[in-house]
Amino acid sequence: MGKNEQKDPNVYFFVPNLIGFTRVFLVLISLYFMSWHPNYCTIVYLYSSLLDAFDGWAARKLHQATNFGAILDMVTDRCATSCLLCFLCAAYPKYAIIFQLLVSLDLASHYMHMYSTLHQGASSHKTVTKKHNWMLRLYYGNNKVLFIFCAANEMFFVALYLLSFTPRTPPKLGYLPVPSFIYSTGELPLSYPTLLAVLCGPICLAKQIINVVQLVNAANALVKMDVEQRRAAKKLQ
């Protein structure tokens, strides 16, 4: 190797990717605690989610944005949320089909959106243009909006996770009588998880609407690409 030749950098050891690997490790730890220690699980899970904001910042700050890092980030998000929703299926069997649909919607919408944007020549699945729906432009075009929606979405599911455990001590605010289809015991504890669920629930619902819009937008883009390819093929015949 000549003196002027430089060795290719090891992308795996870029700072944003190391943060990504740390997130994966923390998610695995949270899964270990998930069924029997909600406090440990919640702390580790939320710490992993918090790091999601730092890997992107590090990538921009250190000029270490990579294709691998972008995919690692998205896959980690999808897998972590899916694992939590799988637990909620067992914790709330009456609503299992809802959580199953949420997992399916989350995976399908993000995969199809990524596939369509990259096939249209975009450098990232977060790249949106005027052709995209206004909701997607607002969602992906503003990092603060993206963070709020993603954080509230995760916090709502975490709140449901915490509520699935019987509190060791009675909540200071007492209990609220509710129908059994809302809470199995008929008495909803007025605790921090309850307040968190109430605050984050509407944003979580909006996030699911965005996922539907994202799915439809990606499907339309892929169909348009198919039509254009078939037209081009006919011209060559």
From Swiss-Prot:
- Entry binding sites for a CDP-1,2-diacyl-sn-glycerol: G56, R60, T66
Q: What is this protein called?
A: CDP-diacylglycerol--inositol 3-phosphatidyltransferase
Cofactor(s) this protein cannot do without:
Mn(2+); Mg(2+)
Lumenal-facing ranges: 34-41, 93-94, 166-185
Can you tell which superkingdom this protein's organism belongs to? Eukaryota
What does the entry's cofactor note say about binding and number? Answer: Divalent metal cations; Mn(2+) or Mg(2+).
Enzyme Commission code: 2.7.8.11
Question: What chemistry does it catalyse, as a reaction equation?
Answer: a CDP-1,2-diacyl-sn-glycerol + myo-inositol = a 1,2-diacyl-sn-glycero-3-phospho-(1D-myo-inositol) + CMP + H(+)
Cytoplasmic compartment ranges equal 1-12, 63-71, 116-144, 207-237
Please give the function described in this protein's UniProt entry: Catalyzes the synthesis of phosphatidylinositol (PtdIns).
Major localization listed first in the record, in broad terms? membrane
Q: Which UniProt keywords apply?
A: Endoplasmic reticulum, Golgi apparatus, Lipid biosynthesis, Lipid metabolism, Magnesium, Membrane, Metal-binding, Microsome, Mitochondrion, Mitochondrion outer membrane, Phospholipid biosynthesis, Phospholipid metabolism, Transferase, Transmembrane, Transmembrane helix
Catalytic residues as annotated in Swiss-Prot or TrEMBL: D77 (proton acceptor)
Q: Name one GO biological process term.
A: phospholipid biosynthetic process
Organism, per UniProt? Schizosaccharomyces pombe (strain 972 / ATCC 24843)
Topology class, membrane: Multi-pass membrane protein
Its annotated compartments are: Microsome membrane; Endoplasmic reticulum membrane; Golgi apparatus membrane; Mitochondrion outer membrane
Q: Name one Pfam family in it.
A: CDP-OH_P_transf
